[in-house]
């Protein structure tokens, strides 16, 4: 769609580039017939995209700057960047920002697949929801927030879950479990089960990983092969679900009334809420 506007994906390598394209779309949306972003819905089916996945960016860059991988006291170093990308989303979308509290994930999918918007924040797992638009009409960009060195930034990549082996199980069961896990990622049958569309469609970080039938996965792999630095998921370091929920509530309040006072609520939820929830988790 942005090709119709005279842009290509190569025109966007930073937040400044993204902002330029997005605001041009908004300026010409009546002429073009579409908006820049799908609605940033903040109901329970959609808010995780912003209180968790989008919030990952300022956390990741703070960790990188400070040389850490976890903290009990986040500083909010990149909260201005978080505000900038959130402002861009909510002020250049398909609906008035005051309506976002009731907008859903399904609304965003519908807006994207019916070509009401150019950009839709989600991951490779959402391919099934948007495949009808056609693979040739799909691409992926990093989430740029104006952080230093982001021209070398790749896609956000990670996992929230892990396979664990119970140390209290019998030695035989532990070995059988390890053998099975090894079989899953090394054998032909196991990797087909793990990676193929007929199986679970996973991407596995092993040599036997199969080329995915999901084009979004292959785009993500291309970024890594070209030397772009993937953004780690920091979700497991977020102190609690309550922290996410409080942050989401503050983002929703701010979207409806974009004042500095309401952004202060976001800062408080992000920084003070982190310290509070981290302390509670250690009691």
Model regions: which residues?
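Short, small-residue-biased leader/transition segments that mark boundaries at the very start
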Residues: 1-2
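Extracytoplasmic/periplasmic substrate-recognition and gating elements
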Residues: 5, 132-198
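Short helix-initiation/N-cap motifs at beta->coil->alpha
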Residues: 13-17, 99-114
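Extracytoplasmic/periplasmic solute-binding protein
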Residues: 16-71, 117
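Glycine-centered hinge/linker elements that transmit conformational signals in sensory
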Residues: 21-23, 67-102
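Conserved C-terminal helix/tail region of periplasmic/extracytoplasmic solute-binding proteins
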Residues: 27, 225-283
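Alpha-to-beta junction loops
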Residues: 32, 114-122, 136
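Short, solvent-exposed loop/beta-turn-alpha elements that line the ligand-binding surface or hinge
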Residues: 41-44, 59-84, 132, 145-155, ...
């Amino acid at each position: 769609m942005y090709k119709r506007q005279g842009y290509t994906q190569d025109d966007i390598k930073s937040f400044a580039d993204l902002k330029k394209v997005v605001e041009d779309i908004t300026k010409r949306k009546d002429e073009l017939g579409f908006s820049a972003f799908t609605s940033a819905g903040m109901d329970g089916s959609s808010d995780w995209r912003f209180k968790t996945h989008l919030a990952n960016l300022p956390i990741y860059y703070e960790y990188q700057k400070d040389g850490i991988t976890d903290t009990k006291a986040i500083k909010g170093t990149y909260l201005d960047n978080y505000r900038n990308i959130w402002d861009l989303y909510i002020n250049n979308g398909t609906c008035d920002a005051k309506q976002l509290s009731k907008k859903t994930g399904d609304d965003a999918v519908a807006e994207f697949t019916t070509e009401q918007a150019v950009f839709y924040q989600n991951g490779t797992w959402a391919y099934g929801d948007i495949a009808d638009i056609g693979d040739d009409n799909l691409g992926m960009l990093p989430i740029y927030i104006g952080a230093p060195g982001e021209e070398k930034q790749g896609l956000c990549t990670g996992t929230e879950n892990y396979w664990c082996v119970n140390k209290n199980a019998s030695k035989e069961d532990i070995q059988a479990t390890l053998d099975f896990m090894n079989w899953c990622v090394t054998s032909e049958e196991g990797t087909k089960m793990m990676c193929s569309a007929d199986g679970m469609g996973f991407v596995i970080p092993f040599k036997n990983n199969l080329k995915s039938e999901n084009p979004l996965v292959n785009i993500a792999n291309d970024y890594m092969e070209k030397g772009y630095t993937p953004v780690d998921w920091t979700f497991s370091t977020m102190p609690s679900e309550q922290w996410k929920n409080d942050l989401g509530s503050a983002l929703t309040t701010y979207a409806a009334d974009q004042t500095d006072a309401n952004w202060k609520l976001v800062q408080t939820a992000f920084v003070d809420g982190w310290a509070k929830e981290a302390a509670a988790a250690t009691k």
